Every structure is written in structure tokens, then in C-alpha cells.
Amino acid sequence: MLMLLVRGTRYENHRPKVTLPTPLGGRSNEATVCESPSPDTGIRWRRSDEALRVNVGGVRRLLSARALARFPGTRLGRLQAAASEEQARRLCDDYDAAAREFYFDRHPGFFLGLLHFYRTGHLHVLDELCVFAFGQEADYWGLGENALAACCRARYLERRVTRPRAWDEDSDTPSSVDPCPDEISDVQRELARYGAARCGRLRRRLWLTMENPGYSLPSKLFSCVSISVVLASIAAMCIHSLPEYQAREAAAAVAAVAAGRSAEGVRDDPVLRRLEYFCIAWFSFEVSSRLLLAPSTRNFFCHPLNLIDIVSVLPFYLTLLAGAALGDHGGTGGKEFGHLGKVVQVFRLMRIFRVLKLARHSTGLRSLGATLKHSYREVGILLLYLAVGVSVFSGVAYTAEKEEHVGFDTIPACWWWGTVSMTTVGYGDVVPVTVAGKLAASGCILGGILVVALPITIIFNKFSHFYRRQKALEAAVRNSNHQEFEDLLSSVDGVSEASLETSRETSQEGRSADLETQVPSEPPHSQMY
């Protein structure tokens, strides 16, 4: 016992050793609650039974000392038992000595749940916080998994274990279907590049007109024209393969070769040729315009949709170069024309990639591309399962059917049958006739159903996720907040990329300050917990 005499007044101080209960989810510890006078003032800085006034993210509450004493291992419990102001300041973010108020820059929603914990002794999971943010808040306030109520503990632990693996473990893509702020920030950074560019405002609006169909009425019209040209090009390619056009072009080619001229100039129907030239001119206009208006040339050539646009016009110009290299305009002989015809056929086959241009105007096609990009493991597993199954059942079918001469003559010849059987396609061009062969076919079909269904489910879930995410991003950037997007376009004139980052940080600080100023300095009714 310590006895002090201060100005005729005797103070007695006992230093009892108090063993704190085990912190919820933490290790047991011992602490000595010191009620000695403050070394600076000579008297205790707070009474032990004084209510604790706290301010958490703008939410002010009074907590009774008796409620905090029930949980001395928590942060507020240790703050209530702090022996000096210096010790208390280490437990909070700030302290107002005049108002005797402790400030914590933490989530106010979790603090309301924390108040319920001090009343009942049980903590409930908040749906507004993800499991990781909830765990960080609980650790900060000195709570653990044991503090969770029985109704929420199993759900919390399950979400905490499965959430990191509910998506791609090695992928940086967030599992939330809400549009990621980083994706919207990428658009903002791209727009900021026009601030220092020549004719930046005009280029920016033209670029948005070509890239965002929902930006304005001209952008919608441009998108409709682009889709129509793509469909017309695909239709012309399909019509060109009809027998009527093939016979007509073959007769014209024979007549041209007999006259010593190139057959390539007369093979195409005049109408289809003019339509092809118009489509090529439009595609070339699109590629060159996007290249000139792009905020970054380097990013332009890295974007998959831009590469598709380049591939859609590349065969036409390669055909012209091949014709010039092989003497397309001179009568040098039929052999060179034959080589040119083979080259042109290869280049014409590349025109089929024009159908991928529709991905620029289709959310589903873009979602499919993102799904395949993030599902290479599942696709690899699917191919591995199919390869193993085809190899096994092809060998069994060859052994059972090789004497029947029904198409199972060799094991490589059986691979085709095994592939169409495991994928449950079943063309019926090759079928087993023996009992053993039919049993092998039945096992192949059942095995294919099980093997294909496993990775396909994961791929389908990823496609659904990317589709919902893409729709949410489009709604956030173009539809639901169009006016704010227009304000952003006006604000980036003359703004560099660095200044945009600074303004974004300043706005975040301003929103935090606004949250604090919304709460009055003194609440009309103090609440005691």
C-alpha cells in the first residue's frame, strides 16, 4: 500500500494484481490496473467509475464503466482501465481533453455492433462488411472468433475459408460482381491523357463516340452502322460459297485462263466484290480512326478488340501484296496464278475472324472471352480427362471390334469414335456391333458425362460472374451515372494524370471530413451503454 500526503490530504493507493480474462480469440494475459496518481498532476486523471465518451467515425456514445469492466481484454476495456492520459492515447487515435472524448477512425457500422456486444456479450456478423474487413475490425477492438454469436459463427467461418477459393486463387479479379473502382479509374486515367494532347477535347469526344455506344445518339448510330457492316460482310462471305456462284465463277475463271489473263479478277461476283470493297473501306476507317484518336498508342495495340479489327482487314491487303508479288496484273503463266489462288484462299479464310468484331458491341462475347482467359486451368483439365478417356476406350473398342471390319481397324482410327462418344455427340458413322464393343461404348458415354460435367460447371459459374460484372460496370460508367460521367469529362480538360490522382485523394479526405461534420458536437440525447 502506498500512502501520499498532498497539501494536507492523505491518499492511499493499492496496486492489486488483476488477471484479465482471456481476450476473445486471443492469448491469456495479465495486467495490473494501476490507480496511482498521474505523475504529472499528482491526482488520478479519470475516476474508475466514470463513463467513457467515445467517437467512432462520427458516432458518439457513452459507455458505462461497469459494461466495459466485463470485458477488460478489449480495447475499450483497456482504455477504461488506463492509468494515465499517455497510456490512453496509445489506445485511441485522438483525445479531446476538454470534452474528455476519445476518437477512433474506424468503421462506425461495426461500432454499433460492438455496442451490442458490450450489452449481450455476443457479436453478430454485419452483411455490409466483407469477412476480411469484419475480421480486421474485430481484431482491432480486441475481439476474436469466440465473441461471435452461435447463429453467426458457422456462417462467418465458412465464408472466411471459402471466399478466397470461391474464385480463381491466382487471379487478381475481385469476387464481387460490383464494378471495381480500379476499372472505373482506368477509364478516368485514359480520359486524363487528353488534357495535354492537341485538340484533346475533340479527340476525347470522338473516341467516346466510337468506344461507348451509350454515350450519345451519334455513338448509337455509329454502333448500328458498324454492326450492319459486319453482318453484311459475313453474309457476303456465306453467299459466295453457294453452288450457283461457284459454278459462275469457275466458268469465268476458265475463260480468263484460256485468254492468258489472271483468274482472280473475274472469280468474284461484281456485286459481292463491291460489297467487299465497301466493308474493307469501313473496317479500315474504323481501325485508322481508333488508332488516331486513342489516348495511348501502346495500349491500343495491346487491346484484344483492336487486334481483331486489324486482323479483319489484314487478309485483303495481304491479298493485294501477294498479287503484286506474283505478277497478278501481268500474263506470266498459269502456274503463278495457281500459287496466287492458293494464297488468296488462305487469306480469304481469315475473313471468318470478322465475326469476332461483334464482341465490341456484345457484352456476352466479351464475357466469354474473359471466361476463357481465366479458365485455362479448367480447359486444360477437361482436355486431359478427354485424352485419358479416349485413349482407354479406343483401345478397348479396337480389341473388341477389330475382327468385324466396321471401322475400328486401328487405335488411331478409334480416337474419332471415342471423342464423339465421350462428348455425347454420337454421329453414328462408326458403331460397335459386338457385345463387348457395346459395353465399351456404354462406359465411354457414361464416363464422358461425368468427366465433361465437372469442369464445365466451374466454367459456367465464371461466365455468369463475368457477365454480371460486365453489365454492372457498363451501368456504372454509362447508364446509371451518365451525368456524373459528363461532369468528369468536363473536369479533365487540361488536367494531367498526376493532378487527377491528387484530386481523387483530396476528394476522399473531404468525404471523410463531411462524415464527421454531419454529427453535432453535442448529441441532443446522450446514450449510455
From Swiss-Prot:
List all topological domains (Extracellular).
Answer: 240-270, 323-340, 399-411, 432-438
Assembly with partners or alone: Heterotetramer with KCNB1. Heterotetramer with KCNB2. Does not form homomultimers.
**Motif stretch (Selectivity filter):** 424-429
The family annotation for this protein states: Belongs to the potassium channel family. S (TC 1.A.1.2) subfamily. Kv9.1/KCNS1 sub-subfamily.
Disordered: region residues? 494-529
Q: Which organism is it from?
A: Aotus nancymaae
What name is this protein filed under?
Delayed-rectifier potassium channel regulatory subunit KCNS1
Where does this polypeptide localize?
Cell membrane
Gene of origin?
KCNS1
UniProt xrefs under Gene3D superfamilies: 1.10.287.70, Potassium Channel Kv1.1, Chain A (3.30.710.10), Voltage-gated potassium channels. Chain C (1.20.120.350)
- Residue ranges with Basic and acidic residues bias: 502-514
A Pfam family for this UniProt protein? BTB_2
Matching entries from SMART domains are given as: BTB
Q: What does this protein do?
A: Potassium channel regulatory subunit that modulate the delayed rectifier voltage-gated potassium channel activity of KCNB1 and KCNB2 by altering their kinetics, expression levels, and shifting the half-inactivation potential to more polarized values. While it does not form functional channels on its own, it can form functional heterotetrameric channels with KCNB1 and KCNB2. Each regulatory subunit has unique regulatory properties that can lead to extensive inhibition, significant changes in kinetics, and/or substantial shifts in the voltage dependencies of the inactivation process.
One GO term describing the cellular component: voltage-gated potassium channel complex
**Where is this chain primarily localised?**
membrane
Membrane topology per the entry is: Multi-pass membrane protein
Please state what the annotation says regarding this protein's domains: The transmembrane segment S4 functions as a voltage-sensor and is characterized by a series of positively charged amino acids at every third position. Channel opening and closing is effected by a conformation change that affects the position and orientation of the voltage-sensor paddle formed by S3 and S4 within the membrane. A transmembrane electric field that is positive inside would push the positively charged S4 segment outwards, thereby opening the pore, while a field that is negative inside would pull the S4 segment inwards and close the pore.
Intramembrane runs of residues: 412-423, 424-431
Q: Which segments sit on the Cytoplasmic face?
A: 1-217, 294-304, 362-376, 468-529
